Amino acid sequence: MISMKALETLSGDISVYNDQVTYVLFEKLATIEGSVMFNAPSLQSFEFPVLTTVGQDLNLQGLNEENTAAGSIASLEIPELTSVGGVLSVNNLAKLTSMSFLKLKETGGLDFHTVPVMLETINLPEIETVNGSIIMEANMEAPPTGSFVPQRNDVLQAFGGMDKLTTIKGQIKIKNFTALKQLPDWSKITTLGSITLDYLEDVSGTLLLPNARLKPSEKQRPRLKL
């Protein structure tokens, strides 16, 4: 267990690479000026109840020594988080079914490129500005030898929020959510690099981007791929 009950502000980084850590608790930590990196394949609980600001990246991983997803944490919530200066990444947590960032308004990117096929909920009701990309992709689990049977998420039916988004300077990429019924209301988006929607087999309705202007970045040209 990692627990710091009195720490309120950290001017540097937190870096933990440890396969024995099961519980993480920073009760009073509100501001981290640097980055946060946890790779903890035994993780069961991850609590930052008053954290509001991370200056650089916030990265939570569960890769084990076989380089596969691990950990038994089912629910992830950082309830007071409003700003991440770098990229917010949550990947390779094998049992994760829910993640919520209920007050997050601005981040340098959202990287959920290997979330579990059983993930049921992603809540981002207040997000407005993403200064990089939004990547949400369900795991393609390793198939048996000699076959290719992709495993896609067939339980997540809707994203919680994302209808306040105005700026995405990179791309939106959403892939392998075959039960998704409806996309967020993206009518407020004015700036967007590109958008890719792949293997969303049950989505209905109309994709509306009435105010969006596709703007190229140094790494990627404007693109709409459905």
Language-model region placement:
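Concave beta-strand-loop units of leucine-rich repeat
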Residues: M1-L96, S100-L226
